[in-house]
Amino acid sequence: ADPVANETILDGDHAVCHVVAVTAAKMNGMKASLDGFTIKNGSSQFSSVGSTTIGGVKFYQSYGAGIFIGNATVDILNCKIVDNTDIRMGAIRVDAGAEALFDNCVVADNATKSTTTYNCGGLWADGAKLLRINNCTFSNNKASGVAPCIYVFGDTGGKTNVLISLS
């Protein structure tokens, strides 16, 4: 099968808080992988910051409309994370000791609706154990507060060959 001609789309249809939510017990040599997906149209409409706890990780309903990764080891490869809108953390949230690799991904046209200072349109990492971003493009992500594109709290890893435009 040709993944370019036969795109696999995970579409939240503007009706879900997180199109993809990942948490799993961390074990040496084990990880979850998403490869070649388009993840789009996640849209949290909640103005409050309610949460659901899964495996000891709080998944906040207004954070990470496209992907929320909490306390798991995950590789996101060759994915497009696009057109997600959230109250506070637009497209991606990496949290609670998570270890994440983003490689050859496009993160574009995501936004946060919040006008507070605690928001980000693209990728927000706070409490992540390891975050690596390689060969990725971040473009046209919007936020009015802290970071339209990428916000990383603490030293969590490396970023190489990352293109940021119109954010």
Model-derived segments and their meaning:
Residues M30-N41, T73-T85, E99-K113, K129-K142, ...:
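Right-handed parallel beta-helix
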Residues A1-D35, K40-A72, R93-G97, A125-A128, ...:
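Extracellular beta-strand-rich solenoid/capping regions of secreted or surface-exposed proteins
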Residues N6, M30, R88, N119, ...:
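Residue-level signal for beta-strand positions within conserved beta-sheet cores that form or flank
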Residues F46-V49, T115, V146:
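Short, hydrophobic secondary-structure boundary micro-motifs
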